């Protein structure tokens, strides 16, 4: 049993293990649990549970049998029947070794293994089950989500269908609209075609009209010619008539003698007989009839010779005249003036000639008791063409005078006879205009009077010129073109006539007649004296309103309706003449040329006077010749148009027409008693004021119907500005000076309304009520302020008028002044302390009124004008100082003064809810809106009653302004980081430059801000690198991102907004506007990439050297390791080298190498041993035994020109080229030890030479280095100064580039041209040592408005730098030959007299032609600074008189500018092509001849030398003692520089073209010498001047001598062999610009052959 049990145990224990293992292996191999479905998983789970149950049963069974098995194993081993068990026992019991494994498997261990495996399987199955459950849950959730997504998909699909339907409808609508719009477009196109057709028609019509106009002009010219011809005929006829008149006078004298004889005979006959007297009377009557006939003939003749009349000295008996036509002058409100004290005709008239022809036979017509009427002038002056009357009847009238011809009584200053027609509104007063008539006249009024009344040569209103006799009238055509001018001058003349007319008439001689002058403008009155005529009155039309003249303090009132004049002749019975007043009235619209002369024969003749509809006033005029006062012409009415808020002025509705009857008293009898009226108390006042005593009754009660009382007369006098009448009325007792008419207008109101300051002063001194208001509540101050009479306003304010008085509508004087744009009145009222916030009934304030008119000045005054302290008011300039510029271009007044008006007043709304900003924005008054926006309290979002903001009602311009209202202006600056110390030549380079100001609005996004910054930088780079003066606006259209200097937005290293770093494209949470406000960023700084980043952008911007060239230099250093920079002194070599070293150092450090810069300054004492120590100590020279280090060394050798290159670098040339241990070089140290060294591969050697070219032995060093030549006439030096100074100007103007015509631009251009012209002249003089780089000119001061600062700086630069260098170079050249080896020329310590003269001449020529030429300062101002320049006062005649008579035969007299560098690659100085082997001698001749024909630099001395060789030249010992050929060449070149261009017309030396000069030194061997001149400088087109006579002679002589033949060309300096080839063709391009020639040269100058031997002769070109 035991054996069976023991033997069966393994089988029972293996069974479940094998089953479980097989199941697991099958599960692993056949399927994956993750891929089972739910049902399969359930089945698998049931299988697992069954296995677990079976396992539990096995375990229980084994436990039950365990005891048996234990006993069996323990005690059954001694069974001898089983040897296997015995062997097992022995094995286990033997040796006690625990590590021995049993021979057979223990069932218990098998069971334990099975149990462990089952546990593992259980754990794995439970884990898989949990994973399956979680996946099941996820699956369920995904199914739910899928269902939700499907439902949402269905909804979206439905919505999509709906949207598609809607879109279809929209598309259909759009298609319809497109069709409609296309139809409209077609219609508009058709309309446009029609309009264009109409436009073409209009153009054709316009052209036709122009042609007609030209034809009319030609016609008028022809008519004028005809008139001139007729006038000449008239002159001839006048002379004939004068001769006839002389004959008649002689005949009359004979007749008088005959009469005397007859009288004597009669007396004798009386004695002899009593029956003969009856026969003498008919004879006498017959004689008188003869005289009458002769005078009648004169009347007819007078009409035909109207235009030519001389000054007449009347005889004493010329008082008798025929009836004549007497014009009634339309002088409104002008006082009448009687005859002059010297007689009825002023014989001292210097301004105007009397219109009276010489007549001698009219003294017997009228008796001497009749008032003397001067004869009508022999003028036929007709303002509007010929009159319509026929030949006058000598018995009835003389030829009727036109409206403005000379009056019959007295000659007026404004009435020049013949053609100087008087202004129609002028009064009739004395022509003399002497001081006796105007004792108290204002000189300004007198001057104005003479201006408008015509002096001896001033044109009158018809365009004629008042000249000394004989003068002529112009044609009617020319008069018609001057109507407007005539009206304007009439108005001013009328205004001046009131004050220029005498107020106190001098007593005239008895018999001088009084004169009546009435009428208005433009009606023209005519008065004719007839034998049996009755006065007749016609009513005229209202006159036009003249322009308002608020500026004249004494401006009279506007013209008024005319006074009707009835001249009563009832008391002139003994004269037999009557006065008929005929007023020919024309409406204002009718032109003056429409007036015509009415013949008096057509006037009705009645026995009784025809009275006008209104009562007349009988003016009894005294015969004493006293001046008639202004009462005779005082008129009321015709007020100017009422201003807004003001009603019509006083008496405008019922303007009084005052008919006046002027009675001409007979002879000189006193006034009859019947004509006198009571009231003699007024006679003194009347007489004292210049009135005739006979006017006194008029003032009391005279006439059929008097005026409406004294107060009305007072108002009329005040309204018209009649100070005389007003003062007289104010002296009366009991007169109510505060009387008001129906409208409530007082006399003070009328005077203030019309701007009569004197009347206002009189009324105020008479204590008139200053605040009396009319029926609308307007006071005199309101009226004066509305009309702009600031003097009246000032006077009323001084008399304490109520400045805040409000009318019935609430209008204050300030409001009315603002409403009518009266700036002076506003200023006076504000200074008086008026209230600015008074509102009208409509809610309008003065601010509303000022904005409504769009007057910026008024608004500025209201907002900024303060009440001055201590009575000092702002002057007008202060109140308007600064333009309110949003761009901040000028300093605005609010930067100095703050607004004085509160925010409530600015934001006050009227009845409609509109503020002042609403009004300004709606009317498009951008300037007014801008000023309002400057006020900090403005509320632009305030809405009106229609819920509209200011932006809603604004125009487009104003909307743009409002959108920029709160825009921040942040200056944008460019910084280049730290500027190196001045040792590197960067002391004039600026660290920061302001390029523009950015507008940052509230709605500006960060993207817009980034684009603005990038665009501003791009525009700035393009502007400073352009050829001309560009503004930022000019370059915005340029789409290129890179500028000419290579900078762009990519050159930016970093940007700081205030102190916050920012990069392009970066965005913050806040908008740029909020960000700037919050961080208080005052500027935006752009830092360019510099050497620290391994870039050269900052170096480019600081030095203005193009980035491409700097990168090229850096590439040369990195590639060749040995580079030397050379150029004229001041070419920034040190700065360039140091910046390249910094950039190279940082690049090497970025690559992981350590780098060091070693700098050494070379001087004359720097030895080769010191240089060796420098190389060794800096680890640049390494011993052969030593291993190289990874450290990079950059060695800079500065100022190599101070030492000899060949001596200093000779031993280092070979190892520098071959840097390796294979080519070592042995150097001996100072201690005597020698050692082999080699140059490290990582060593960079850079040097600087301040010399334009190498010479002598230094050329041996040239091939071992890479050379960078910084030529002054090539890039980068050529444009560096221009770019630098332009950037300086832009920075000075805060980013705004000024216009090219700005004085700053001109002075900067001048400084630039000085540098270029100076170098051009120095190069031409062959003194390359004196050439200057741009460094010295970088410090040019830019001070706007002070060009003198730049000139003073230039004088210091000239005296301190330029002149000493030029002096040294000239002495070096003129004293000794150039010495090879050291490279420098030494001048004599004690120059000779001739050398000193050459130096002075050179300095003088350079100063005048290169420095002072082109200076924009005025000549007088420049002369003051010329003395500051030393060397400018040398007589250039010494130079021009010098001649090269001591030159050796066969040598050339001219010499050239030099460049001796054989490795030069750019032919800036050279010509495009060189020697051609196939050039024939004949070709050279032709070219030479053509060149000489165009030679502009030929001098007179050369011409003389060509003609006379040595015979006519000056002895050198007498003038200049010059010892060498170079010295003679120098003087020759100075001659050519100052010849052919006069000192007064200095042109640019830079334009001197390549010359080919010939000198006849030997008989048939003329020498050709070519001068290489600079072709880079700009030239002016007006520089090409014709040859003078001397030059022409020289050309012809040279031509004849050239044909003799060409032997050879000799040159002492290295010159391209084919220099001769292109001389003539270059001269043909005399008018082309230098830029064009530069391009041609640069394109063709790559291949050059240079002669390096100084004394080698060039063979003939055809050899």
Curated annotation (Swiss-Prot):
Sorted UniProt keywords: ANK repeat, Cell projection, Coiled coil, Cytoplasm, Methylation, Phosphoprotein, Repeat, Synapse
Ranges annotated as biased composition (Basic and acidic residues): 1645-1663
Signal peptide per UniProt: none
One MF annotation (Gene Ontology) recorded for this entry: protein phosphatase 2A binding
PROSITE patterns: ANK_REP_REGION, ANK_REPEAT
Modified residues (Phosphoserine): 1524
Compositional bias annotation for Polar residues: 411-422, 583-593, 1582-1599
Domain of life per record: Eukaryota
Function: Regulates the dendritic spine distribution of CTTN/cortactin in hippocampal neurons, and thus controls dendritic spinogenesis and dendritic spine maintenance. Associates with the striatin-interacting phosphatase and kinase (STRIPAK) core complex to regulate dendritic spine distribution of the STRIPAK complex in hippocampal neurons.
PANTHER family xref list: CTTNBP2 N-TERMINAL-LIKE PROTEIN, FILAMIN/GPBP-INTERACTING PROTEIN
Subunit structure and binding partners: Interacts with CTTN/cortactin SH3 domain. Interacts with STRN, STRN4/zinedin and MOB4/phocein; this interactions mediate the association with the STRIPAK core complex and may regulate dendritic spine distribution of the STRIPAK complex in hippocampal neurons. Activation of glutamate receptors weakens the interaction with STRN and STRN4.
Official protein name in the record: Cortactin-binding protein 2
Encoding gene per record: CTTNBP2
């Amino acid at each position: 049993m035991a054996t069976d049990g023991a033997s069966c145990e393994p089988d029972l224990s293996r069974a479940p293990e094998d089953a479980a293992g097989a199941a697991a292996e099958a599960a692993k191999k056949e399927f994956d649990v993750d891929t089972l479905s739910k049902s399969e998983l359930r089945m698998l789970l049931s299988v697992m549970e069954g296995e677990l149950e079976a396992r539990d049963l096995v375990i229980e069974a084994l436990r039950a049998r365990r005891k048996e098995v234990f006993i069996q194993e323990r005690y059954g081993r001694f069974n001898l029947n089983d040897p296997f068990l015995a062997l097992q026992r022995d094995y286990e019991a033997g040796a006690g070794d625990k590590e021995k494994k049993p021979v057979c498997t223990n069932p218990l261990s098998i069971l334990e293994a099975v149990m462990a495996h089952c546990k593992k399987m259980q754990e794995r199955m439970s884990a898989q089950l949990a994973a399956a459950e979680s996946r099941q849950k996820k699956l369920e959730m995904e199914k739910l989500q899928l269902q939700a997504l499907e439902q949402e998909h269905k909804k979206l699909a439905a919505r999509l269908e709906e949207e598609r339907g809607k879109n279809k409808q929209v598309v259909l609508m759009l298609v319809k609209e497109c069709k409609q719009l296309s139809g409209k477009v077609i219609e508009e196109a058709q309309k446009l075609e029609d309009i264009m057709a109409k436009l073409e028609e209009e153009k054709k019509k316009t052209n036709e009209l122009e042609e007609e106009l030209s034809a009319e002009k030609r016609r008028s010219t022809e008519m004028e010619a005809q008139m001139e011809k007729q006038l000449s005929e008239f002159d001839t006829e006048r002379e004939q008539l004068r001769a006839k008149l002389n004959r008649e006078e002689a005949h009359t004298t004979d007749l008088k003698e005959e009469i005397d004889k007859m009288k004597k005979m009669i007396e004798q006959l009386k004695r002899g007989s009593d029956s003969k007297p009856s026969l003498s009377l008919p004879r006498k009557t017959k004689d008188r009839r003869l005289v009458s006939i002769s005078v009648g003939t004169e009347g007819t003749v007078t009409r035909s010779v109207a235009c030519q009349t001389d000054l007449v000295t009347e005889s004493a008996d010329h008082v008798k005249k025929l009836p004549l036509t007497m014009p009634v002058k339309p002088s409104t409100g002008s006082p009448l003036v009687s005859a002059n004290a010297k007689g009825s005709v002023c014989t001292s008239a210097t301004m105007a000639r009397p219109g009276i022809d010489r007549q001698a036979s009219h003294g017997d017509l009228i008796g001497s008791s009749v008032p003397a009427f001067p004869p009508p002038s022999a003028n036929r002056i007709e303002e509007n063409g010929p009159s319509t009357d026929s030949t006058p009847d000598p018995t009835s009238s003389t030829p009727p005078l036109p409206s403005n011809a000379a009056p019959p009584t007295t000659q007026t200053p404004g009435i020049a006879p013949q053609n100087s027609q008087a202004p129609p509104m002028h009064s009739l007063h004395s022509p003399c205009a002497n001081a006796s008539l105007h004792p108290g006249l204002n000189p300004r009024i007198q001057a104005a009077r003479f201006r408008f009344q015509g002096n001896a040569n001033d044109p009158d209103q018809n365009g004629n010129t008042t000249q000394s006799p004989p003068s002529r009238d112009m044609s009617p055509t020319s008069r018609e073109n001057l109507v407007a001018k005539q009206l304007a001058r009439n108005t001013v003349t009328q205004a001046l006539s009131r004050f220029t007319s005498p107020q106190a008439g001098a007593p005239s001689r008895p018999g001088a007649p009084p004169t009546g002058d009435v009428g208005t403008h433009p009606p023209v009155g005519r008065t004719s004296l007839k034998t049996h005529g009755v006065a007749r009155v016609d009513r005229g039309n209202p006159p036009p309103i003249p322009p308002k003249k608020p500026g004249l303090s004494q401006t009279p009132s506007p013209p008024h309706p005319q006074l009707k004049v009835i001249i009563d002749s009832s008391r002139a019975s003994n004269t037999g003449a009557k006065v008929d007043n005929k007023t020919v009235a024309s409406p204002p619209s009718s032109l003056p040329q429409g007036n015509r002369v009415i013949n008096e024969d057509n006037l009705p003749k009645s026995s009784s006077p025809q009275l006008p509809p209104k009562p007349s006033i009988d003016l009894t005029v005294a015969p004493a010749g006293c001046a008639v006062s202004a009462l005779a012409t005082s008129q009321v009415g015709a007020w100017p148009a009422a201003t807004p808020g003001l009603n019509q002025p006083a008496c405008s509705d019922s303007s009084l027409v005052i008919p006046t009857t002027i009675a001409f008293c007979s002879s000189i009898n006193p006034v009859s008693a019947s004509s006198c009226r009571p009231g003699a108390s007024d006679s003194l006042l009347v007489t004292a004021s210049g009135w005739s005593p006979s006017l006194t009754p008029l003032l009391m009660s005279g006439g059929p119907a008097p005026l409406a009382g004294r107060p009305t007369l007072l108002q009329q006098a005040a309204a018209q500005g009649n100070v005389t009448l007003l003062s007289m009325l104010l002296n009366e007792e009991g007169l109510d000076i505060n009387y008001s008419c129906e409208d409530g207008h007082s006399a003070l109101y009328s005077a203030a309304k019309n701007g009569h300051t004197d009347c206002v002063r009189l009324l105020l001194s008479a204590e008139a009520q200053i605040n009396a208001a009319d029926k609308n509540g307007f006071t005199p101050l309101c009226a004066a302020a509305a009309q702009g009479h600031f003097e009246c306003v000032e006077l009323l304010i001084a008399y304490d008028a109520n400045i805040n008085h409000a009318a019935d509508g609430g209008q204050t004087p300030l409001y009315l002044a603002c409403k009518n744009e009266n700036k002076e009145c506003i200023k006076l009222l504000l200074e008086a302390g008026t209230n600015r916030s008074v509102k009208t009934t409509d809610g309008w304030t003065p601010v509303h009124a000022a904005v409504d008119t769009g007057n910026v000045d008024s608004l500025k005054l209201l907002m900024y004008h303060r009440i001055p302290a201590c009575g000092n008011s702002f002057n007008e300039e202060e109140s308007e100082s600064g333009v309110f510029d949003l761009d901040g271009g000028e300093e605005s007044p609010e930067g100095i003064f703050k607004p004085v008006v509160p925010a409530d007043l600015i934001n006050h709304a009227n009845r409609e809810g509109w503020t002042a900003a609403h009004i300004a924005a709606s009317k498009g008054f951008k300037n007014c809106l801008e000023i309002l926006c400057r006020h900090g309290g403005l509320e632009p979002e305030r809405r009106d009653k229609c819920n509209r903001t200011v932006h809603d009602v604004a125009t487009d311009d104003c909307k743009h302004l409002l959108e920029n209202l709160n825009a921040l202006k942040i200056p944008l600056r460019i910084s280049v980081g730290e500027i190196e110390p001045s040792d590197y030549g960067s002391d004039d380079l600026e660290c920061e430059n302001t390029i523009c100001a950015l507008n940052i609005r509230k709605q500006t996004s960060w993207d817009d801000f980034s684009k603005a910054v990038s665009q501003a930088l791009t525009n700035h780079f393009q502007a400073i690198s352009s050829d001309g003066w560009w503004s930022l606006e000019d370059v915005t259209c340029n789409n290129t991102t890179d500028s000419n200097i290579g900078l762009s937005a990519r050159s930016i290293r970093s940007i700081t907004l205030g102190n916050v770093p920012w990069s392009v494209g970066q965005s913050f949470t806040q908008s740029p506007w909020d960000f700037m406000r919050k961080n208080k960023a005052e500027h935006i700084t752009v830092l360019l990439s510099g050497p620290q980043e391994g870039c050269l952008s900052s170096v480019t911007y600081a030095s203005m050297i193009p980035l491409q060239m700097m990168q090229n230099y850096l590439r040369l250093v990195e590639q060749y390791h040995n580079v030397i920079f050379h150029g004229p002194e001041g070419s920034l070599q040190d700065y360039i080298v140091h910046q390249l070293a910094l950039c190279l150092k940082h690049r090497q450090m970025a690559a992981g190498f350590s780098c060091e810069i070693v700098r050494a300054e070379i001087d004359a004492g720097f030895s080769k041993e010191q240089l060796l120590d420098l190389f060794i100590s800096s680890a640049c020279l390494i011993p052969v035994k030593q291993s190289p280090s990874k450290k990079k060394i950059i060695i800079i050798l500065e100022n190599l020109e101070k030492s000899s290159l060949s001596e200093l670098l000779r031993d280092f040339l070979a190892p520098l080229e071959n840097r390796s241990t294979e080519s070592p070089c042995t150097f001996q140290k100072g201690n005597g030890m020698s050692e082999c060294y080699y140059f490290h591969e990582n060593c960079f050697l850079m040097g600087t030479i301040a010399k334009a070219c190498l010479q002598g032995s230094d050329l041996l060093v040239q091939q071992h280095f890479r050379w960078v030549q910084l030529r002054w006439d090539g890039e980068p030096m050529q444009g560096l100064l221009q770019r630098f100074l332009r950037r300086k100007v832009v920075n000075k103007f805060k980013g705004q580039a000024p216009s090219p015509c700005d004085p700053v631009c001109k002075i900067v251009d001048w400084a630039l041209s000085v540098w270029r012209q100076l170098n051009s002249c120095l190069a031409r003089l062959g003194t390359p040592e004196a050439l200057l780089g741009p460094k010295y000119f970088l410090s040019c001061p830019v001070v706007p408005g002070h060009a003198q600062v730049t000139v003073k700086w230039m004088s210091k630069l000239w005296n301190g730098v330029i002149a000493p260098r030029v002096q040294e170079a000239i002495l070096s050249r003129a004293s000794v030959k150039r010495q090879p080896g050291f490279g420098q020329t030494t001048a004599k310590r004690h120059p000779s007299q001739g050398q000193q003269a050459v130096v002075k001449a050179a300095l003088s020529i350079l100063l005048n032609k290169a420095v002072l030429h082109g200076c924009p300062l005025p000549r007088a101002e420049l002369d003051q600074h010329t003395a500051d320049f030393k060397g400018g006062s040398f007589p250039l005649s010494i130079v021009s008189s010098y001649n090269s008579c001591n030159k050796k035969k066969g040598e050339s007299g001219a010499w050239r500018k030099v460049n001796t560098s054989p490795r030069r690659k750019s032919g800036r100085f050279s010509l495009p092509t060189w020697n051609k082997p196939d050039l024939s001698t004949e070709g050279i001749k032709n070219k030479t001849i053509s060149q000489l024909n165009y030679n502009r630099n030929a001098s007179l001395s050369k011409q003389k030398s060509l003609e006379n060789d040595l015979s006519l030249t000056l002895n050198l010992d007498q003038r200049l003692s010059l010892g060498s050929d170079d010295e003679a060449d120098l003087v020759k070149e100075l001659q050519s520089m100052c010849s052919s261009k006069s000192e007064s017309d200095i042109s640019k030396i830079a334009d001197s073209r390549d010359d080919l000069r010939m000198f006849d030194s030997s008989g048939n061997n003329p020498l050709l010498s070519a001068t290489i001149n600079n072709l880079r400088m700009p030239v002016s087109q007006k520089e090409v001047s014709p040859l003078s006579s001397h030059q022409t002679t020289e050309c012809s002589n040279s031509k004849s001598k050239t044909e003799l033949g060409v032997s050879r060309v000799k040159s002492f300096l290295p010159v391209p062999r084919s220099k001769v080839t292109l001389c003539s063709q270059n001269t043909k391009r005399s008018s082309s610009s230098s830029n064009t020639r530069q391009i041609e040269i640069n394109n063709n100058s790559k291949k050059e052959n240079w002669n390096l031997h100084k004394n080698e002769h060039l063979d003939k070109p055809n050899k």
